[in-house]
Structure formats: C-alpha cells, structure tokens
Amino acid sequence: MSLGTSEQSEIREIVAGSAPARFARGWHCLGLAKDFKDGKPHSVHAFGTKLVVWADSNDEIRILDAYCRHMGGDLSQGTVKGDEIACPFHDWRWGGNGRCKNIPYARRVPPIAKTRAWHTLDQDGLLFVWHDPQGNPPPADVTIPRIAGATSDEWTDWVWYTTEVDTNCREIIDNIVDMAHFFYVHYSFPVYFKNVFEGHVASQFMRGQAREDTRPHANGQPKMIGSRSDASYFGPSFMIDDLVYEYEGYDVESVLINCHYPVSQDKFVLMYGMIVKKSDRLEGEKALQTAQQFGNFIAKGFEQDIEIWRNKTRIDNPLLCEEDGPVYQLRRWYEQFYVDVEDVAPEMTDRFEFEMDTTRPVAAWMKEVEANIARKAALDTETRSAPEQSTTAG
C-alpha cells in the first residue's frame, strides 16, 4: 500500500548536507606539552595535513608543516639538531620560525627556503596550536583562560586520555545543548540546565542528582548526592569544565578538559583529562587515584557518545521539541569559526541565553527511575526466593 500525496508531503526528510571543506579557526589542543619535550620530533595529523612538533634547546615547542620544501621528505622522521629539525632526506635544517637555517653540503641557503610555521601556546601543561585558513595570527582577545589548579601543588597532575573518532567534530559540539542525552546515554540525572553563548565562548551550566537505578550506592562507600558542572568552550574545540562531585558531608573539586582537533572532515582526535583538588580526605596518592577513577568514569561516558556517533547520520535539520536545547542557536555560534573573519555576523557572536524548563523532564525521569528501582527489587526478591521454593518442592 502506497502513501497518498498529502501523507507523503507530511513526511519529515533528513537533510544530511556535507561537512565544511575548511577547518575551524581557533586554538586547538594537541595534548600534554610534556609528551613533546623528549628531544624527538613528533608527527601530528591535523587540519587535513601533517605537522612536525618538537622542542628546541630552550624547551620551547615548535610546529612546522611536516613535509620538507626541498624534496618532500618527512621532517617528523628526522632528527632534532640544536634548535632545528633536520630532514632525514638531505639534512636540511629548519628553524622554528619556518626558515631553513643550514644546509651542510651547500654554500648558502636559498633565500626563499621557508615553510609554514604554526603559532603555539604552551600553557598549564597543555600544548595548543592556532589554525586559521586565512593565515591570520591569533587575535589578542581570543584566548584560552588559565587553569589555576593545573600549576598548583594543591591539585593532582593531569590524568589524560586520547582516542580517534571517525565522524565530523560538530557531533561533539552539539552535546553542549543536549540535556536529554545525559539521562538516556550517560545515565545521569540533570535537574538544572542553562546555556549562554557570547563571542567565542559557549557555556553550559548543569546541576545533577545521583541515580539509584543505574548507580546504586554501595554499602561502605561515600554516598554521592549529585554534581555541579560549569563548562565552557573557548573557541571551537577546547572546553574547561569546573566539575564538583557532591557527597554526603563533603565535595570533591575537579577540572575536566574536553578537547579535540580535526584530522579530516570525517575524523577527529578526542582528548580529555582531569585534575582533582587535594584535601584532608584526598591527600597524595589517594587524590591521584581519585582523579584516575573520575577519569575512567568520564572515559566510559565518551565511549557511550562515540557509539552513538558511530551509528547516527549527520543531520542539518534536526526536528526538535520544546524540551530540547537551542541546537540551531549553538550551530550559528559554531559557524563563526568556519567563515572568514570579515564574514562573522552579529547573530553568531551576540549574547544568547537559554534556561531549560526542567519541570516535565525531571518528573518523567523520576518516574522512570522509580520504576527501574521497583523492577530491580522485584527481580532480586524473585531471585532470592527461587532456591527456597526449589528446596521446599524437593
């Protein structure tokens, strides 16, 4: 049986579109800075090309295009010699400013021997690289804020995770407005949710309560009450989340980093890391163990996200209900990083606020949690009584 014309016209079709051909303008984190300070060159596939990353004699990290402008050798397979990176093909020595400094077998270096040097930022133990399709340097007002705990002995060192994801990086950006997925995908329970977009910053403020159906309190363990999360993207790919876990009688303060850089239009490297504030309850090794436990918990959450992304389709025209977040407004904000600077429109950067009315979601989710707990209790009762019935029958 075929549908009539009127019924056919009512069907909502998905507009998948295609990912932007260019990569986002902004600061992108490449990982822990210390990993690049071992005296060796490192290759990084990013922005549709290959980069070489190394630290000079002053421990200052340098980044160039990886392919030598002489004959195309891969500089990331070369050697660090003094402050320069030496090509493995003919030993041309390239400085951090992109200029060829020395050719051992040549009388002179050609004046035009220059490759692309990338702006870097080594801050709070993290390495950032600036990407701009127009080739402009980073503006003074587009910055990554300092993370006080990252350089303090009162906090742990970074616990860091890295994985590749085979999809366009817009998928992870959408999560900042998607309150409902925290309940259904991550088994969290948001009770307050607000977004603020302004300039190059997009923020999410969330409060959550513990879920006894999915993460029941274990006897002898601290009881979690809930969590407070104040998370902001500074630019297209780097999020700082001031995350507080609330337990009976005390809180645990942490900072979660959620960041990525594009490899190609359909692949990105996802990284996330955590530090935890030490306290009388969390000293020394115990604080680091807590950071690792929290980090492993966050890792499971990202694995849940990745499984969704792996199987979903790109959708440029999502069909939303009132209790969905401001997806279209977020995507307008995100678009500013994919157009030339002179084409950034006010609607991409003007302040926008949206606080979710959580009345309906919280009521529905509470019923679901209660039903899950009741179902589990009935199953436990049935399981415990089964052996007794078997013995009586015998």
UniProtKB/Swiss-Prot annotation:
CDD domains: Rieske_RO_Alpha_KSH. It comes from Rhodococcus rhodochrous. The keyword S-adenosyl-L-methionine does not apply. This is 3-ketosteroid-9-alpha-monooxygenase, oxygenase component. May be involved in the degradation of cholic acid, a steroid acid found predominantly in the bile. Homotrimer. The two-component system 3-ketosteroid-9-alpha-monooxygenase is composed of an oxygenase component KshA and a reductase component KshB. Coiled coil: none annotated. Its EC number is 1.14.15.30. [2Fe-2S] cluster binds at C68, H70, C87, H90. One of its GO terms (biological process) is lipid catabolic process. Pfam families: KshA_C (PF19298), Rieske (PF00355). Binds 1 [2Fe-2S] cluster per subunit. One of its GO terms (molecular function) is 3-ketosteroid 9-alpha-monooxygenase activity. Keywords: 2Fe-2S, Iron, Iron-sulfur, Lipid degradation, Lipid metabolism, Metal-binding, Oxidoreductase, Steroid metabolism. Residues 27-129 form the Rieske domain. Induction: By cholic acid.
